[in-house]
């Protein structure tokens, strides 16, 4: 099919420009009508409507045998025009729109060709005589045609000198035009719009996702994109895990483009956002919406003591509170919350041990939140709900025993610990740091005395916050947060057994 596409695009142009030069010149008014701004304006409005508007000229071209020559002259002259437009800010995306459908037709020629450009297809219908007549000699004459084109399109030929690959563009638009689009992508905003408009066809390129993509594009384009614009950082989050999972299906071609876009400044995130909605739907968007109700998170930032508490229960409430509460494993905390030992624990080592129970997962969450601006915590929350559902919901009842959490609320030291410098001095996280090295964690969990030995000096030595900061930076801790293994660690009575040496102290 690609050779036929190239034949339909270029050699017949030569032959027809040779055979019907006056006809094509007389037809230049319809060519102008094709290039008249109304269809281009419709292109600016909606790429799909642009394809629709392309269809009527297609029909009108079906009347004229020189339609193939028209389409070719359109591709050559109008592509030069579009390139000169591409020098302007927004239009290059339109040029890429007009060009990318043929690449789609090249990939899956018949169906998408029928969608995007029947002109090449009809020219293919005309093709057999034309190909038999003009196959190779017209190519040679094609190489001659630039001179003839120079009479008509001398300024575009100057632009041809800028991009000699345009002739090859008409034959293989994707390669040259993609390179051009990448050079456009070097510009700040427009390439992203081009990429946005381009991604729907790539999504349609994906075989089965073609049916999925229309709703996806319709969802992402207007409302969820705006909602995602509210949380751009979530885009950065979705880039790492969800985009990988997402991109497996549609994005092989589009992902490469998105990576080149991602290298660009701001809008690539919006492009990734357009992809994100499916991930949001995968993550059960209603909970994400409930998560997007950041007031509790804002309240986290508002009240430091409440922030310390909100690490576990409010985040739980954000993420369908009971399961995340079970995530935070309040049952062990409840055992901790037996206020007499906790009173004894209220001595800062006890707060450290206390925070150990909720904080390994929740503090890692807060660390990831601290590394990100604010929204990543929501992403981590969205991650936690399934884990929360995995955790026993019965602890929800134990959660309902709010007295332990209330006793936590009594912990102003934990609040002050939430203020990172005292937390660093408590260095709950530094021993957790040693724990978070999962091999050592495994060994530590198996050998609690070894853990105590390691923890006792490290707590003093690790009181230096820098290791905690480095922990905050490592996605490894985030992966630990994801692993149910750490969750199981938090659930383990092992945690309480760990606290016992501190109590002894």
UniProtKB/Swiss-Prot annotation:
Bias-annotated ranges (Polar residues): 1-16, 66-78, 165-177, 188-200, 233-254, 265-293, 309-329, 345-365, 373-383, 399-408, 435-448
Comp. bias (Low complexity): 17-33, 40-59, 96-122, 129-140, 147-158, 201-226, 453-474
Region of interest called Disordered, as start-end residue ranges on this chain: 1-474
Protein name: Putative uncharacterized protein ENSP00000383309
Species whose genome carries this gene: Homo sapiens (Human)
